[in-house]
């Protein structure tokens, strides 16, 4: 975690006069940004010195060299070429580093001494807006956290997209869940002790002075930035902790960006109750966009993302990580998807969007006045598509699609301006010229004609000079260093006319200048400079004109993003045979022929669909069956179906009826991460504890193999207690997979006591010769075998080891009897202290009792035996 008082080890020595003028200039710039890497412009390179050079050489794998000495010591140096610096900058930002760009702001050719330099830009992981430094399908967020006795305030901004939001949470667990959801690239926290463990060592965490996180100063900063008298319109007037975080974030942005931020026009308060809650473990276990091994392939997002545009892809990721509980919003999304499917409009929309660029981020660069020439042409082409998109949407009867139709707006004037002003194929860089279209400005056209006519003049001059000099190989050319020249080979140089003045000597040629060519050069170069100057003026005018339309254009880009996501949902529904879910107000979770969307997509064989039926009288399924039989897949698929329904997507099932859901909570062992130094069992218990404390009757809980990380009896006792707590206290919807067959007795106890709605289901397997065939079908009732030894054989365990295990199993079964729950007395749910699940260990009293034959005892002998037995207890 980077601290606020970290200082660069490079210091001006007491003998500062010993340093060279260049190093004095470097130290002056570096002293203002001690915690940042300083890219110091020197000609065609950005150089780094001293500790910056050592660090950059290590991180970027570039050469560490030295540049003479200064202050009596060698100067460590490393550098990157200016023309390729963005690639190196992107790598540093991805590693959590921040960089200050120090440019030459004077003209080296005109400078009498040292050229003037100034830090003109600061690039940090959370504030980048350059296209080359961004992941086009993922938000790049800057977050600030403040804390109080009541909890934590969060503020986060997507500077590249123009979004600014806040929230408040009341616990460390909720804070960790929000950070897992948002995945900020950079995180600002007060420089204080006792921050949660999960923040320590996290890449991109910046400690800032605590006084920057003050609620009152934050409020004043927000009012000044948005030019308001109060914050009630944003809904954060009574959120001091969130306001403090927002003020700290805004201060950091203004400090690093060194310019106005006109694209941040409001701040929104996220309401936690509007979304389904998922903690960090649940997101990890369900592999929404990243697998537990860190791979991003074969995830739910990978299957679901059929968006055409980058901005649509980012919106889909946000939806996926924040499934909504707002039934009206979701029903409108489902209806919109259905309308697109029924009319075939999804195909038309997606085809039109193939010519649509990332308007959201382009508009940010327009607002920040950093837009490049091709940003203008992309925006122009995007606005030109609007009439076609509006024509597609106009006849559709979906309320949500009609809202999007209205939000698209009509931007004919802006489109016409860009069509007339921007060249059809503008260059990558403005300095190359040719950005403004011919015919847009008469003065610019005249200046360009001078440059164009210059080419013909040079052709004519070359022919005349060849004729007058008699040198057939004479050439007229130009380079940026020496300007225009007449070139004659070494062998012909003696024939050069007397009025030729030598300009440059090469190995095989001599270059000359004449008064006529010099006069022409002055005229042409002046025209080109004036042309670029005029073009820059027109370019700035376009930025001004677009700045006045930003609000409407941002709404348009937002509507296009949502339309892209909805059309993608429609495409996926048809391609994958998904159906529209039904969201009910009554409690239920009924899924017919459900499938796991990711497993089905990657399997070569047909996926075996399964049903799920949960309701107030049937809230828990105890799931048994062999390892590899599909228990975890079955649990996850139902959670993913619920999640998909709550982002507005169709779902992989023939029918899904879903009542209110407030949380999805999971404990699945495949997600164990020991990086924090906790044992597997400790992780298991911590995640289980979170679930038991947070699950409600509207929560969906997945529990996979609880108790496996400890001894058999401890594990069984814990699994039993957890199952009882979920069924009896939390009363949530629970899918409880276990290898403890004894737990299947809970269903019998539930029925006997009219209790908490527990039922048994199982997944079966069939032995076919030496092969084991997993059926993957969920059936009612408990499993009768675990097939553990068969699975071990499938995994490649040596035959001798498997045979030894079979012999040992036979011995254990003979000694202890079959401990299957069907042969055991069920434990009543209303008496959680009575397990009634274990085969009791033998004792002296038990052995003595077994030795008695009641039919052979007299009354006196029976009484004496009873006393003996009592004494043994």
Swiss-Prot record:
Keyword DNA damage: yes
CDD domains membership: ABC_MutS1 (cd03284)
One annotated GO molecular function: ATP-dependent DNA damage sensor activity
Source organism phylogeny: Bacteria, Pseudomonadati, Pseudomonadota, Gammaproteobacteria, Lysobacterales
Described purpose of this protein according to its UniProt entry: This protein is involved in the repair of mismatches in DNA. It is possible that it carries out the mismatch recognition step. This protein has a weak ATPase activity.
NCBIfam families: mutS1, PRK05399.1
Entry keywords, A to Z: ATP-binding, DNA damage, DNA repair, DNA-binding, Nucleotide-binding
Family recorded in the similarity comment: Belongs to the DNA mismatch repair MutS family.
Top-level taxon of the source organism: Bacteria
Record protein name field: DNA mismatch repair protein MutS
Pfam hit, one: MutS_V
Originating species: Xanthomonas campestris pv. campestris (strain 8004)
BP GO annotations: mismatch repair
Positions of ATP binding: 625-632
GO cellular component assignments: cytosol
